[in-house]
Design a protein with these regions (language model features):
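Active-site cofactor/cluster-binding pocket
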Residues: 1-147
Length: 147
């Protein structure tokens, strides 16, 4: 399979923030548009606040890879606090991008990204969800920013 036929996305969040739900919603939307998809979470202790990782593969052809994603095209960080305890840029392709839920600008957050030199996008998903939805559901604006 040509790697350009497949987009791989890795999500980082905490239990209860909706990263898994956003991942699965993206898979459903891509499937509904005729794509082949995978969407699955990986997490340890099932408790609110524990770090979780979720993965998407979206392709025009059948996805024959069945493993975690180690070299994603995109990384979505739903909880900025994870940047200091998880290597969110691990394996991220140089021509990819990272989307981070933060009040900081891309220039302000870049020093925390362990030397990553690719595209950095930031969005204050907590503020947006509080203003629009009335509660902190950061997964919703993060999903919109990803699409």
């Amino acid at each position: 399979m040509n790697q350009r036929d497949m987009v791989e996305i890795r999500w980082h969040g905490r239990g209860g923030q909706g990263a898994k739900t956003a991942c699965l919603l993206l898979a459903d939307a891509a499937f509904s548009s005729g794509k082949y998809v995978q969407g699955f979470p990986e997490y340890g202790p099932e408790r609110s606040g524990a770090p979780i990782t979720a993965y998407n593969r979206i392709s025009n052809t059948r996805c024959t890879i069945h493993s975690n994603i180690y070299e994603p095209d995109y990384v979505v960080v739903v909880d900025e606090g994870l940047i200091d305890c998880v290597d969110v840029t691990a394996g991220l392709k140089a021509d990819g991008a990272i989307i981070i839920n933060t009040k900081k600008s891309p220039e302000e957050i870049r020093p925390q990204l362990r030397g990553y030199t690719g595209r950095v996008c930031t969005i204050d998903a907590n503020r947006i969800s509080a203003e629009i939805l009335g509660k902190a559901y950061p997964n919703t604006p993060m999903l919109a920013a990803t699409v």
